[in-house]
């Protein structure tokens, strides 16, 4: 009975995907669709480079900080995670000024702000799985902090880092509210989906929606599966 209930629950969660097979007329690509894909993938990729470059040292610092300081930093990071996207977009526009709006820079900066908290918090959780004693021993053997990270810390925590990065990727790629305020142009996939829906209806949305889902969902799903497999291997 419990298995049947769980099956129904799972089907209910997946039910929205059935909308991809709804008969709404012939699908068609609209002008600017491919540009929206290029904008989203290219600028989100750049945003992720910045997130990793800034977020990894921050995660290392917070993970090794005294408990009280760690709590404070985690609270600060949670603010960036919990801040409503529309409010964040307005605040960024006010903070950076009107010249900032509707530029590639605005697009990337907004994506960094909406996603870096997810990456840092996930990376902190990954780093907490690394025994501190191993890092100390590596340091005593003469390895500098950079060498300790690459030889000891990262190999143990790499799947956790991958999960954190995949969550940040999805968060940045799918952001709509903040991007709508700060960078309506250049139009990425979320904004293009919305404008196509408003202007042309569902048939114009579905092709881009399929690409959107195909670029957003596989990475976190794969990272989660690999992390679970590794956990099961360690338990065995």
List the predicted regions and their residue ranges.
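Membrane-water interface segments at the C-terminal ends of transmembrane alpha-helices
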Residues: 1-128, 156-177, 181-184, 196-229
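Short alpha-helical segment that forms part of, or immediately flanks, the ligand-binding pocket
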Residues: 77, 135-136
């Amino acid at each position: 009975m419990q298995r049947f209930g769980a099956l129904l629950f799972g089907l209910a969660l997946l039910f929205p995907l059935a909308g991809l097979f709804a008969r709404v007329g012939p699908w068609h690509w609209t002008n600017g669709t491919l540009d929206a894909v290029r904008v989203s993938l290219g600028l989100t990729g750049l945003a992720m480079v910045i997130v990793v470059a800034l977020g990894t040292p921050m995660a290392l610092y917070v993970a090794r900080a005294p408990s009280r300081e760690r709590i404070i930093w985690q609270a600060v990071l949670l603010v960036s995670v919990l801040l409503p996207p529309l409010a964040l977009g307005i605040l960024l526009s006010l903070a950076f000024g009107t010249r900032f709006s509707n530029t590639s820079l605005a697009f990337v900066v907004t994506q960094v702000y909406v996603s870096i908290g997810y990456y840092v918090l996930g990376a902190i959780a990954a780093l907490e799985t690394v025994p501190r004693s191993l890092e100390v021993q590596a340091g005593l053997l003469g390895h500098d902090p950079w060498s300790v990270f690459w030889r000891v810390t990262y190999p143990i925590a790499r799947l956790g880092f991958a999960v954190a990065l995949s969550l940040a990727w999805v968060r940045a790629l799918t952001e709509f509210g903040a991007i709508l305020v700060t960078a309506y142009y250049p139009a990425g996939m979320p904004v293009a989906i919305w404008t196509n829906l408003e202007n042309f209806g569902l048939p114009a949305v579905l092709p881009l929606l399929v690409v959107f889902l195909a670029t957003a969902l596989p990475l976190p799903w794969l990272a989660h599966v690999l992390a679970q497999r590794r956990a099961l291997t360690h338990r065995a």
